[in-house]
Amino acid sequence: MKGKIIEMRLMSVMMLLALMWAGCNDEEPTPTEVLVSSLSVRGEFIEDGGSSQMSVIVTPEDATNQKVDWSVSNQEVATIDETGVLTAVTNGIVTVTATATDGSAVTATKSIRVSGVQGPIVLVESISLSVEDITDGREKQFSVEVLPTNATNKDVEWLVSDESIAEISEEGLLKPLKNGSVKVKVEAKDGSGVQTEEEIVITGVADVSDGIVVDNSNDLLSAIANASPGDKIYLRGGNYAFGSTISFNKDGQEGNLISLIAYPNDSERPVFDFSAMSENSSNRGIQLSGDYWYVKGIDVFNAGDNGMFISGSNNLIEFCYFYENSDSGLQIGNGAANNTVLNCDSYYNADSSIENADGFACKLDAGDGNKFIGCRAWQNLDDGWDGYLRGTDNITTTYENCWAFLNGKLKDGSVGGGDGNGFKTGGSDDKLLKHHAVYTNCIAAGNVVDGFDHNSNRGDVVLYNCGAHGNGRNINFGTGNIANSLTIKNTFSFEGGGDSYEATTTDISNNGWQIGLTTNASDFVSVDIELLKSPRKTDGSLPDIDYLKLVSGSDLIDQGVNVGLDFSGAAPDIGPFEFEN
């Protein structure tokens, strides 16, 4: 019995040991693996020719294996190592790819721009310099061609041989300082030693040290507004756009004028362009209310009313052009006196109603002593010159060497609805006012209505050595409201309508229709009216033309009478031009 009990205890121990051994040999259960679902590549562009550290964001964050393999699309642009360091090889764009290594086959890409890689240095071999002479005294931009085209550094340095004659900028803009010759030199900056030079001649630089030079609208307006006696404003050529009236209201002094002058020798004229204006009687271009101004060499274009209105006195307007304005190109009024308009042109002035706008007008309430010398007026809708009075009386206006032609016609040559006279001497609402007028060496030609028009002017009118050709009526001083006096000497009239020469007192002698003379086209070198439009001389004076110049043998030669004008030969010739041998 006791033996069985011992045997049973041994079997229990053995079973317990067997169970313990089995428990010790069981493994832990293996957890489930988490795969990569997406990748996102991060990294900066290479701009210095160096390298950039690439990185990757793995989703999900608890992916079991987050290691990636790196690759690039073009190893000639950049290479990448196993840690994601991207190294530049040459300039360009490369695609970087990250690939998961957990068997998920997930990839991601990013395009990287590579720049700043320096290749082999290519030196400059030659420089070609493009320059030209300066004839107008203005700045000029020069240029160069640097070869080879793939030179590493194509920058150049600009130099001039004499900085007292000209200055030149880093970009090759040359600024003339005075007339003369100067060498322009260009040197390569890459250390190659390549250089070239060219000599240029500078002309057209004016001495403007006595004034200021302006080249833009704002500076111009400021200079005009702040002008003082003796100031000189030199205006560079070009277009100056304005939308409102410019007031010249400062006063100069006798012998100490305020001057606005086109910059000497510029290749283009300064144009006051009022195209932005609407047509309105208040929209004058320039309002000159100041005294003692000198304005030379400007154009006034497309004002909404007068191009220039002068209400000041003792002003000189020289070599200016007034065109395509909506009223008179230049008008004198409001008591303005003793103004001189010298060598100016006024043409193509017309309003939108096609019935108004003169070339020049000294009219309405103008003052005494105004003069027009060497001026031309053509194809103005109304009159070439208008002297109609309202609000003043007994004034005298003088005209010397002035040409009025084709007035009453528009720019396109068609006839408009204006009065169409060359010189309208005067007239008034009550037909009583006196506008005295003196015309010497003046021409009226091709005007639609009258060449020299009385228009009920009650003043004294004088014509010395004038010519009237091809007008509706050449000289028309009728019997109604006749002039106080009419003096005509050394003047011809031909190829026009019937003339009349009525006045209370007349002194009419030695003219082309008197003393047995007849005037016709055979007396002249040319009767082509279009020649009157010929360009002026560079100093602004009238052109030398053949129109109405006497031919040798004309019976108008030496048939005049001395009226105090210069002449050659035994006596003055008849007409505006002395015969030239």
Question: Would you name each region that the model predicts?
Answer:
Residues 25-208:
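Extracytoplasmic soluble-region selector
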Residues 82-83, 171, 245-249, 255, ...:
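Extracellular beta-strand/beta-solenoid scaffold signature
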Residues 206-247, 573-576:
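Acidic Gly/Asp/Thr-rich repetitive segments characteristic of extracellular carbohydrate-active
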Residues 213-215, 237, 241-243, 250-304, ...:
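Right-handed parallel beta-helix/beta-spiral solenoid domain characteristic of secreted/periplasmic
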Residues 228, 250, 255, 267, ...:
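Parallel beta-helix/beta-solenoid
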Residues 236, 261-263, 289, 296, ...:
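Feature marks extracellular polysaccharide-active and adherence modules
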Residues 401, 435-546:
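Predominantly extracellular beta-rich ligand-binding scaffolds that present long acidic/polar faces
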Residues 536-581:
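Surface beta-loop-beta hairpin patches that serve as ligand-binding interfaces in beta-rich domains
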